Amino acid sequence: MNSLQQLSIADTLTTIRPGKIADRPFWNRFARQFIYCPAFEFSKVNGAASYRFHVCDRFGTDHTFTADSPDAPLTPIWAELPVGPVFVVVDAMDASGNTIARVGERTFYRNAPFNACYPPKSCSYADCARKTYEYLFQLDFIQELSKGIVDPDYPLSCYPSKMLSSIINGMVNYAEMNPERKADAMRIARGAADNLIKTAIPAGEPLEFFPLTYSGKVIKSAGGEKTIMMLYPASVGRAMLKLFAASGERHYLDYAIKIGEQYLKLQLPNGTWHLILNQADGLPNAANYCCPTGIMLFLEALAEACGDIRYRTVAKRGVSFFSDLIDSFNWEGQFEDVAAQKTPYQNLSKHIATDIYLYLGKIQPDAPEVRRGAREVQRFSEDPFIVWEQPGWAGSPDAFNERTEESLHTRNWGWLRWHTPCALEQYRCYVPVDASVAKMIRYFLLMYDLEKNPLDLAKARALGDSFTRVQCSNGRIPTWMSPESPLSDDWINCMFASAEALKLLAKYEEQ
């Protein structure tokens, strides 16, 4: 076992944010797989002197230990458990060691920890990023934007703010990378931006000037087709500022200011914004709040671009909302095509957790509480969302499902088709997504910058290496981390995110 493997195994004995400490809830009540040692929400039984844990692995071996509390972590046996399905039974015992009650049961998947021995990359990270940009540039949907046309045949054109803002950013980046194609790339960026401005909510309406979250034949929506998810106007605003900086064309800054003014009016006393607003009346469609990181970054950039400190003042108020999210650990998935979470912890994702510490890690890198929180979020983000390797057991997923329908491997769990290492998106889309891999590359690099722990850099590289191996010969990085998936299933915004993560990782290639 090499030094990185030793670091990895030792780290997996850490229990992430256990519940019932300082009244914290158990965040993992809906989690279905673990790399790090878990503890579960089992309640005490009157008259119990101790609690006996029976932990059955995929081979049928019963690992047992006794604890004073039914929610004790599985630390005594965690290192012994092989990768595969695990079935936990906890019994309450009296002072004589007799069973007096069944406390609870739990099924989960013991996921493989990072082992530092994966296949090498097939090309440099910089080359992989370049090929991805070349592939994206020639796509029909992107080329049509140079004529001001949004091709409705691309199914995901129904999410204009998300798709077109990513294309603006991507084409400005590509123009910088490839001067020979700068004019063409900038023409595409302008076409995407002009379309967003042209189709924005008209003046005089409650949400005037906001770009549309949904348009055309909508596949799925979080709150209805005539709603605005408040994350996305900020994404568009940041793209407009990037285009203004690259082109000098004032009307893109002017439109970003219009978006910024709406955020100033709509900020709530708690420092954030409602997640979803009805387009017709501007009222909240759901009780959920935004994680405000993206909005704050937009407002800070807007203040820098136009010199108006009001935007920076409003952005600073968002920091106060971070503490609520950090304390609750309710890192809900916030996506335009998934209904807003109604039950806490039911649909977790690593995105808003990592976004917060990517932000705090830049502005307060030496703060001990930021470093502690960032490490805790790294473990959380890896625990239920990274798959370092395919399961190596000979069991049947169908047999595993027979044990409980709430187990990890549902009928949709297609592990034999997954190209690993990979990262899963959210509980409600519990499959590999390249943008999730990209986010974790960026996050592991943040952790490496903060602490210089070689394990973080090794994990970032392992994920980047996976990109180089899954990339198709034409430069495509499949959204679902499977070259067999149809081209029409690719999310362009995700591929741009992957290319940018690879460009960042290339800066660490020789370290």
Task: Please place each PLM-identified region on the residue numbering.
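Pro/Thr/Ser/Gly-rich low-complexity, intrinsically disordered linker/stalk tracts
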Residues: 2-46, 106-112
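Solvent-exposed loop/turn segments flanking beta-strands in beta-repeat/beta-sandwich domains
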Residues: 44-59
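Short beta-strand segments within Ig-like beta-sandwich modules, predominantly Fibronectin type-III
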Residues: 64-72
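Surface-exposed, short loops/turns at beta-strand junctions within beta-sandwich domains
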Residues: 77-85
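Extracellular fibronectin type III
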Residues: 95-113
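Glycan-recognition and catalytic cores of secretory/periplasmic carbohydrate-active enzymes
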Residues: 112-511
